[in-house]
Amino acid sequence: MTAALLPRVGIGVDVHPFSPDRPLWLAGLHWPGEPGLAGHSDADVVIHALCNALLSAAGLGDLGTQFGTAEPEWRDAAGTRLLTETVRLVRDAGYAVGNAAVQLLGERPKLRERRTEAEQLLTETVGAPIALSAATTDGLGFLGRRDGLAAVATALVFPAR
């Protein structure tokens, strides 16, 4: 099999500190009663990590490359808007998304109550299966101190042509 026909894998990471004066958006869902995250857009670490993984897999760089903070049209942009545009870029580059997995890292909020809802939204937005999981750091580091959230994602794309 030639390299042009092989699937490609990307890894994405995103980290944001909490910002109590902002709403919390995670995996495209609003989380009322939880402190938000600081960032140029909505700071949805789950979607940002997923976008980074998809862009990496397609050889398109990362969120900063595609939607930099110098671009005013992306200020306060919804993560779902960034994800939709990322999927378009991946497809325009000649790839189809096979699947992806994202793990949220932090002490709160607890993902379990809304995991299925989040997976459905992400899967519909991407047009491919997206698995979502979460883990704590058992009180270690900035995540354990509840200073912010992080997410790590992997994505598989394959040539669509």
Swiss-Prot record:
It holds the Pfam family YgbB. Disulfide bonds: none annotated. It catalyses: 4-CDP-2-C-methyl-D-erythritol 2-phosphate = 2-C-methyl-D-erythritol 2,4-cyclic diphosphate + CMP. It comes from the Bacteria. One of its GO terms (biological process) is terpenoid biosynthetic process. Its cofactor is a divalent metal cation. The keyword Metal-binding applies. A divalent metal cation binds at D14, H16, H48. 4-CDP-2-C-methyl-D-erythritol 2-phosphate binds at D14, V15, H16, H40, S41, D62, L63, G64, F142, R145. The keyword Membrane does not apply. Keywords: Isoprene biosynthesis, Lyase, Metal-binding. It is an enzyme of class 4 (lyase). Pathway: Isoprenoid biosynthesis; isopentenyl diphosphate biosynthesis via DXP pathway; isopentenyl diphosphate from 1-deoxy-D-xylulose 5-phosphate: step 4/6. Transmembrane segments: none annotated. Its EC number is 4.6.1.12. One of its GO terms (molecular function) is metal ion binding. Involved in the biosynthesis of isopentenyl diphosphate (IPP) and dimethylallyl diphosphate (DMAPP), two major building blocks of isoprenoid compounds. Catalyzes the conversion of 4-diphosphocytidyl-2-C-methyl-D-erythritol 2-phosphate (CDP-ME2P) to 2-C-methyl-D-erythritol 2,4-cyclodiphosphate (ME-CPP) with a corresponding release of cytidine 5-monophosphate (CMP). PANTHER family: 2-C-METHYL-D-ERYTHRITOL 2,4-CYCLODIPHOSPHATE SYNTHASE, CHLOROPLASTIC (PTHR43181:SF1). Belongs to the IspF family. This is 2-C-methyl-D-erythritol 2,4-cyclodiphosphate synthase. It comes from Acidothermus cellulolyticus (strain ATCC 43068 / DSM 8971 / 11B). The lineage of its organism: Bacteria, Bacillati, Actinomycetota, Actinomycetes, Acidothermales. The gene is ispF.
